[in-house]
A protein has these predicted regions:
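Peripheral, non-AAA+ core regions of ATP-driven protein-machinery
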Residues: 1-2, 131, 165
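Noncatalytic partner-interaction/assembly domains of nucleic-acid and motor enzyme complexes
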Residues: 1-111
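Extended, charged alpha-helical coiled-coil/arm scaffolds that mediate oligomerization and mechanical coupling
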Residues: 83-149, 153
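Phosphate-handling catalytic cores of nucleic-acid transaction enzymes
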Residues: 150-167
Length: 167
């Protein structure tokens, strides 16, 4: 059985981020451009954050009541556990302290999951001799480019050409 670490997710961390956004007005602007809903591993947290992000983009206030209403309007309130679940999440958080650090950690966990899934796919392709090697290399390059951009380290990495001295 895989642990949360092996799955590269942390449900408590996800809830800390969502809870902070529910209880503090200044929290969502700190993470809205750093996180995407799919970065949340737990489906309910994914749905809650998607609703909050949509509300923020539309200029709507975010709190326990408005998020509950937004989820209900989207037909997702029962799927996330109802009003009780939103209340439970918000009650677990005292403040938005360390929110940006939590967001960075969540982003890193998501990137690790993406890496694991992408590399599994590449390993599967390499085992299938009917797949053209050039196609595998192109897919490898796409995966690495996507991961570089998601990590925000693209500007700090050197190209393969520079590393092997062809440029």
């Amino acid at each position: 059985m895989m642990t949360e670490t092996a799955n590269h997710h942390d449900a408590e961390l996800e809830e800390a981020i969502i809870g902070a956004c529910l209880i503090e007005r200044a929290a969502m602007p700190l993470v809205v451009d750093k996180l995407r809903p799919e970065m949340f591993y737990e489906e309910k947290n994914h749905e809650i954050f998607a609703a909050m992000k949509g509300m923020h983009r539309a200029g709507k206030s975010i709190d326990l009541i408005t998020v509950k209403n937004e989820l209900a309007a989207r037909g997702k309130l029962d799927a996330v556990g109802g009003p009780y679940e939103l209340t439970r999440i918000s009650a677990r958080v005292a403040s938005s302290a360390h929110l940006e650090y939590h967001a960075l950690t969540l982003r890193q966990l998501y990137t690790r999951r993406s890496m694991r899934l992408g590399f599994r796919k590449l390993l599967s392709l390499t085992a299938d001799e009917s797949v053209d090697l050039d196609d595998i290399l192109v897919e490898s390059h796409r995966l690495l480019e996507r991961l570089k951009s998601e990590c925000g380290v693209a500007d700090h990495l050197r190209s393969m050409d520079r590393l092997v001295g062809t440029r």
